[in-house]
Amino acid sequence: MIDRKDNNQFHLVSKYEPSGDQPEAIEALVDNIEGGEKAQILKGATGTGKTYTMSQVIQKVNKPTLVIAHNKTLAGQLYGEFKEFFPDNAVEYFVSYYDYYQPEAYVPSSDTYIEKDSSVNDEIDKLRHSATSALLERNDVIVVASVSCIYGLGSPKEYADSVVSLRPSQEISRDQLLNDLVDIQFERNDIDFQRGRFRVRGDVVEIFPASRDEHAFRVEFFGDEIDRIREIESLTGRVLGEVDHLAIFPATHFMTNDEHMEVAIAKIQKEMKEQVRLFEAEGKLIEAQRIRQRTEYDVEMLREMGYTSGVENYSRHMDGRSEGEPPYTLLDFFPEDFLIMIDESHMTMGQIKGMYNGDRSRKEMLVNYGFRLPSALDNRPLRREEFESHVHQIVYVSATPGDYEMEQTDTVIEQIIRPTGLLDPEVEVRPTMGQMDDLLGEINTRADKGERTFITTLTKKMAEDLTDYLKEMGVKVKYMHSDIKTLERTEIIRDLRLGVFDVLIGINLLREGIDVPEVSLVAILDADKEGFLRNERGLIQTIGRAARNSQGHVIMYADTVTQSMRRAIDETHRRRQIQMAYNEEHGIIPQTIKKDIRDLIAITKANDSEVAEEAVDYNAMTKSERQEAIKKLQKQMQEAAELLDFELAAQIRDMVLELKAMD
């Protein structure tokens, strides 16, 4: 039994008060939610404090909230911000727990079967368990998730029904508790005490929940009765206090009881026989033999252990679902009246739409060649329309909402004023004739003032040629393209901010982490070439790169003004006029954002000081030196994760993978 708390209130902690047009945006969003409006858009310009507005709305409507971002890095940033805003509430993080993931696949042309291979991040697995258990225990929960939240997770009812509930004076034998823990996939290990494990010492059972990383619980028996339950430090065993009730959630999200397991196994065997008959009728004897062997092995594991590698492929049978019925996901763990907020919705909704098709084509190949039963096709992400069926109320958040969001609602709430008083940059169009000389002059003007320049081109070749030309002209310039790995990419951004060079050229500079306050000029070459990077949304996003500096300016080099250019320029000008009027009325002088330059590359010294060693050239290292560097980076990654700085942890993880690839 779970003691659910339904009356908790969200409490926002911040030294700031809503300013600019935040109060109006907050009031409008809250009124619409309380008035039963299903969908609305928060159209907020870059740097206007959209996350703070979202937090204010969550506090006022007091509903469990799911915030979806389009990648792990952005989800990590949002998680950190919400954690600061709501220290007294449950702020959870739910993303894919794979550091490395090679999905199961089959390539018929070379007769190559690729077995599923993955590396699970233990810290993220803990946070996923923390998210699901929090949703079942309390109402004041914010879960920040990636699109991983639309993938199959197991039945929330089975998960909740499997909870082992313990109280002092409860009549239960020690051995019964041990059996119950094994049933919910806990592992006994009296030596290595980790998450999802328990250990036994006489009449004392110590349990380490899957959702914790430092605190465990000590259950002390007197005969066949629980004498007391104490919370302890998992490492030292130091007692932290006594508890009146302990709910132990399963160590896996894919739970089923013995009765359901037998029914599921019968269905799996029936489906296997049908598939074998089908293959044999088509003369596919190898496929028939393959599916029989693989399924019989999995069934044996399920009978003996209650689990098998790839158990999720049998989730349709385990959950008792019909063919084609959507899987259970994180969304099913929320109560019916929860709130969804989609961050950067123009990107995220596209991802939600695309996940199903990519997964389906890979699995069909496995089914057709006898590696998986057809029911594996129902272990899948949700289709977009299935996602929509879970939506009670939703807020799309973006500076440039997509067509899909605009079709869902006419309710658009704008947030244009920045708390810093910064204006959207001035945008001008200049002809392509003589553009190189013109651009060179603009770059030198900025460099003399200690400011930086972004240049965006359409092709790799043009970016390379422009880099060579500017170098010949004495400009300190670098070029960033998609082939550059994380190690170099973070180094390049850091060097740009430090002034090691003045100009950064790229094809798509809209990726996360490219917010550089020192950039006062953004030059867009071939601005009149319509396409993905030169459509209205792409141009507005690119213009936004100059919105962090009080001297922000954008030059579009073009011979004609396209419809996309006109709309982007008009929208930027409209915002700028509103911002200028507000600043004048309130006596605000725009200030460039001050942002610390964090060293992501240098390996820190192994002492308590925060002084970093000089950046290291990893290519010049010997193999043993690289191994030592990997150990240091892994330690930093763990420390960053413990401090909940998942953005930094993810970047260090990528560096480690690249260093390993050098050997």
Curated annotation (Swiss-Prot):
Check the record and name the SUPFAM superfamilies matching this protein.
C-terminal UvrC-binding domain of UvrB, P-loop containing nucleoside triphosphate hydrolases
- UVR domain: residues covered: 627-662
Annotated Helicase C-terminal domain ranges read 435-601
Q: Helicase ATP-binding domain location, by residue?
A: 31-188
Motif Beta-hairpin: where in chain:
97-120
Source superkingdom = Bacteria
Chain residues that bind ATP: G44, A45, T46, G47, T48, G49, K50, T51
Matches recorded under InterPro entries: Helicase/UvrB_N, Helicase_ATP-bd, Helicase_C-like, P-loop_NTPase, UVR_dom, UVR_dom_sf, UvrB, UvrB_inter
GO annotation, biological process:
nucleotide-excision repair; SOS response
- Kindly state which keywords UniProt assigns to this record, in alphabetical order: ATP-binding, Cytoplasm, DNA damage, DNA excision, DNA repair, Excision nuclease, Helicase, Hydrolase, Nucleotide-binding, SOS response
Task: Write down any Gene Ontology CC term.
Answer: cytoplasm
Q: Primary place of residence?
A: cytoplasm
The molecular function terms in GO held by this entry are: ATP binding; ATP hydrolysis activity; DNA binding; excinuclease ABC activity; helicase activity
Q: Note one Pfam family from the annotation.
A: UvrB
The record's subcellular locations are: Cytoplasm
Q: What does this protein do?
A: The UvrABC repair system catalyzes the recognition and processing of DNA lesions. A damage recognition complex composed of 2 UvrA and 2 UvrB subunits scans DNA for abnormalities. Upon binding of the UvrA(2)B(2) complex to a putative damaged site, the DNA wraps around one UvrB monomer. DNA wrap is dependent on ATP binding by UvrB and probably causes local melting of the DNA helix, facilitating insertion of UvrB beta-hairpin between the DNA strands. Then UvrB probes one DNA strand for the presence of a lesion.
Its subunit composition reads:
Forms a heterotetramer with UvrA during the search for lesions. Interacts with UvrC in an incision complex.
Notes concerning its domains: The beta-hairpin motif is involved in DNA binding.
| Family classification | Belongs to the UvrB family.
Task: Report the protein name in the record.
Answer: UvrABC system protein B
Q: Which organism is it from?
A: Streptococcus mutans serotype c (strain ATCC 700610 / UA159)
